Structures are given as C-alpha cells and as structure tokens.
Curated annotation (Swiss-Prot):
This is Small ribosomal subunit protein uS3. CDD domains: KH-II_30S_S3. Keywords: Ribonucleoprotein, Ribosomal protein, RNA-binding, rRNA-binding. SMART domains: KH (SM00322). Binds the lower part of the 30S subunit head. Binds mRNA in the 70S ribosome, positioning it for translation. The lineage of its organism: Bacteria, Bacillati, Bacillota, Bacilli, Lactobacillales. The gene is rpsC. GO terms for cellular component: cytosolic small ribosomal subunit. Part of the 30S ribosomal subunit. Forms a tight complex with proteins S10 and S14. It comes from Lactococcus lactis subsp. cremoris (strain MG1363). InterPro entries: KH_dom, KH_dom-like_a/b, KH_dom_type_2, KH_sf_prok-type, Ribosomal_S3_C_sf, Ribosomal_uS3_bac-typ, Ribosomal_uS3_C, Ribosomal_uS3_CS. Belongs to the universal ribosomal protein uS3 family.
Length: 217
C-alpha cells in the first residue's frame, strides 16, 4: 500500500523552516532533550491557549522561545502574570535565561493544528464526527483556504471495527513542493477509546523570490 510522506517534513528547506534554529556538536543530545522538555512543559501549561507552533533559538546560556498562538491574551495573562510564571518555570527547567516571544495567529481556521484540535474537542464532547469535519471544512474554505482534507479514524460511533472516514474540498496537491500545505494530527479521548484526527490545509502556492545577483542592473 502507498504511504504518505509527512507534508511539512518534505517541504523543510524548500518553503518551510526548521522549528529549532540552533546548531550544536557535542551538546546536541542535551539540547535536543532540553527542547523536548521545553515543548512538553509549554503544551501542558498552555493546553487551552491554542498554541500551534513552538520555535526555539539558542545563544550562549540563552534560549529564545517563540509561541504562535490564536489566544495571545491567555498566554500573556493579566499584566503579563502568566508569561512571567511560564518564563520562571522555563528558567528553572533549563538553568538558562529564557526569552519568550508571542506571535498571534490571525486566521486560526487556516492552521491545521488548531483545526485538528477543534475537531478533537468536538469528538470528546460527543458531537458527530461527520458534522465536526464538515463544519471545520466550511470554516477553512470561508477563511480563504484553497483546499482542505480531514480524516477521523478509530471506533467511530462506538463501532466494534475501527475504520477511517474523511472529507475534502478544493485541491490539496501533496506532490507540489511549492504548495503551502499545513498538516497536523491530533487525538481525541472518547469513551470507546482514542480517535485519530488528521488535517491537511492547502493555503496557496509560495512563489520563489528572485535573488539579486551582484553586478546585475
């Protein structure tokens, strides 16, 4: 059977950038484990803050963490109380100085992670899986998506045999490297077990910018 490559991994270095922007030699393993611990802490503390992407950069004894969120007010808190508490915990965890930057996601309906999270929460609230998917697709298309595909798999409606069911609208060209495709998968904990949610969103083509050559007039 044909398998699908991860759409984001395939585009890293072409139209996507790395989530961790640092280089290390002997300390690589330590930095990697530290990054994983940072991500785990943030995802636990800000589970309801619609955080889609966590980027890390490093300097000497300093870590810069950039959070992409649809709810910046919830991350910052009253007078910055929440972000200060998070910074203090990250400082303690890493033993380094941690700087936190917050970037607002203007269109959460075009973010695969947030769309998948929304579908998963609806499934946990016992909303029909077909309805949850179709509503998410309608919202994404209204927000300006060129195409979207969703899939829910597991014991749908408590069926004895697990299956996968998905819907799509528009085009989702997975083979086109210049196509800006956002992909994410989430899990929903239901009374019948876990359901997997996958979302692919095609946001249009990223055209390569012409690089100026020295001496070119």
């Amino acid at each position: 059977m044909g398998q699908k490559v991860h759409p984001i991994g395939m585009r890293v270095g072409v139209i996507r950038d790395w989530d961790a922007k640092w280089y290390a030699e002997k300390e690589y393993a330590d930095y990697l484990h530290e990054d994983l611990a940072i991500r785990q802490l943030i995802q636990t503390k800000l589970a309801d803050a619609s955080v889609s992407l966590i980027e890390t950069e490093r300097a000497i004894n300093k870590v810069i963490v950039t959070l992409h969120t649809a709810k910046p007010g919830m991350v910052i808190g009253k007078s910055g109380a929440n972000v200060d508490a998070l910074r203090a915990e990250l400082n303690k965890l890493t033993g380094k100085q941690v700087h936190i930057n917050i970037v607002e996601i203007k269109k959460p309906d075009l973010d695969a992670h947030l769309v998948g999270e929304g579908i998963a929460k609806q499934l946990e609230a016992r909303i029909a899986f077909r309805r949850a998917q179709k509503q998410a697709i309608q919202r994404a298309m209204r927000a300006g998506a060129k195409g979207i595909k969703t899939q829910v798999s597991g014991r749908l409606n408590g069926a004895d045999i697990a299956r996968a069911e998905g819907y799509s609208e528009g085009t989702v060209p997975l083979h086109t490297l210049r196509a800006d495709i956002d992909y994410a998968w989430e899990e929903a904990d239901t009374t019948y077990g876990k359901l997997g949610v996958k979302v692919w969103i095609y946001r249009g083509e990223v055209l390569p910018t012409k690089k100026s050559v020295k001496g070119e007039k």
